[in-house]
């Protein structure tokens, strides 16, 4: 009997959060191990399907860096990085578009199998993500100048769950590879999302990454600004994205460990949460 009561308590604990976030836009940046491990991938898709089916409005922006690198190697296309960003010449950009499109359609299929009306897009569809060249040395890597959010608003209104590949375009319809974190942040800001969640390969934000006891479960925007200069590496960039989002209309940003099964549900629908909440 006790185990049944525990299950009931889990549902009761989730109820106020389901009510609070009903009809709210939730932007999920999907990447890392949660994309590469089939069991984790299925858990993430289940989480997102549940978010949708209980009344939230999730949108997915996905990465695909490791798959792009593997395909470049297979096809003999040179792939190099500068400051953590892939140098994207014409050939590399074509490979990235192909791989991201393949990933996108697989995600659509996974969610449709869970009863969700999912639809796949890239940033060139309907000029969703308009961008300019980020740096001449990076070739066709784009910085987003405009998000045509009306497309997404109309899809949400029609009960679709948009899944977006981070490919953009300039005014001449040239194709650009866009960092998936940047794309997720820009879209969340344009839609003034209730939440932006980054699925990562770390437990969250650490005050000192070498001290695993220094995990920060919650941090205000002002505290995040003070901490940001002290953080190094990829998490520094991630925290800057969190600050940018919170300063531009996104209510809360979450840094979650995508290696933990059902981390999205644990963060959004439980009192303790998991990972780091910014804002």
Swiss-Prot record:
Site (Transition state stabilizer): 29, 238
Segments traversing the membrane: none
Keyword entries, A-Z: Amino-acid biosynthesis, Arginine biosynthesis, ATP-binding, Cytoplasm, Kinase, Nucleotide-binding, Transferase
Pfam family for this entry, one: AA_kinase
Location, primary (coarse class): cytoplasm
Gene3D superfamilies (alphabetical): Acetylglutamate kinase-like
InterPro entries: AceGlu_kinase-like_sf, AcgluKinase_fam, ArgB, Asp/Glu/Uridylate_kinase, Glu/AcGlu_kinase, NAGK-C
Cystine residue pairs: none
UniProt pathway annotation: Amino-acid biosynthesis; L-arginine biosynthesis; N(2)-acetyl-L-ornithine from L-glutamate: step 2/4
Protein localization: Cytoplasm
Top EC category: transferase
GO cellular component: cytoplasm
Catalytic activity: N-acetyl-L-glutamate + ATP = N-acetyl-L-glutamyl 5-phosphate + ADP
GO molecular function, one term: acetylglutamate kinase activity
Family: Belongs to the acetylglutamate kinase family. ArgB subfamily.
Function: Catalyzes the ATP-dependent phosphorylation of N-acetyl-L-glutamate.
Protein name per the record: Acetylglutamate kinase
Organism ancestry: Bacteria, Pseudomonadati, Campylobacterota, Epsilonproteobacteria, Campylobacterales
Record gene name: argB
């Amino acid at each position: 009997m006790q185990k049944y009561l525990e299950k009931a308590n889990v549902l009761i604990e989730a109820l106020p959060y389901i009510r609070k976030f009903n009809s709210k836009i939730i932007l999920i940046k999907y990447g890392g191990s949660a994309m590469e491990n089939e069991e984790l991938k299925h858990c993430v898709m289940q989480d997102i399907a549940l978010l949708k089916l209980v009344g939230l409005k999730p949108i997915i922006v996905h990465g695909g860096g490791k798959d792009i690198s593997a395909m470049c190697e297979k096809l003999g296309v040179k792939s190099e990085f500068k400051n953590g960003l892939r140098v994207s010449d014409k050939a590399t950009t074509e490979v990235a578009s192909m791989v991201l499109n393949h990933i996108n359609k697989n995600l659509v299929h996974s969610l449709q199998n869970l009863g969700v009306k999912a639809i796949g897009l890239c940033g060139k569809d309907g000029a969703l993500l308009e961008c300019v060249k980020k740096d001449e040395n990076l070739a066709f890597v784009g910085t987003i100048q405009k998000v045509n959010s009306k497309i997404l608003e109309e899809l949400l209104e029609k009960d679709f769950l948009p899944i977006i590949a981070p490919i953009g375009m300039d005014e001449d319809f040239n194709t650009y590879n866009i960092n998936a974190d940047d794309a997720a942040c820009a879209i969340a800001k344009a839609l003034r999302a209730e939440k932006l969640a980054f699925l990562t390969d770390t437990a969250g934000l650490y005050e000192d990454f070498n001290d695993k006891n220094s995990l920060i479960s919650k941090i205000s925007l002002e505290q995040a600004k003070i901490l940001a200069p002290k953080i190094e590496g990829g998490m520094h960039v991630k925290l800057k994205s969190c600050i940018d989002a919170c300063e531009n209309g996104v209510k809360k940003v979450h840094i979650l460990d995508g290696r933990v099964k059902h981390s999205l549900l644990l963060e959004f629908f439980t009192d303790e949460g998991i990972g780091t909440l910014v804002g």
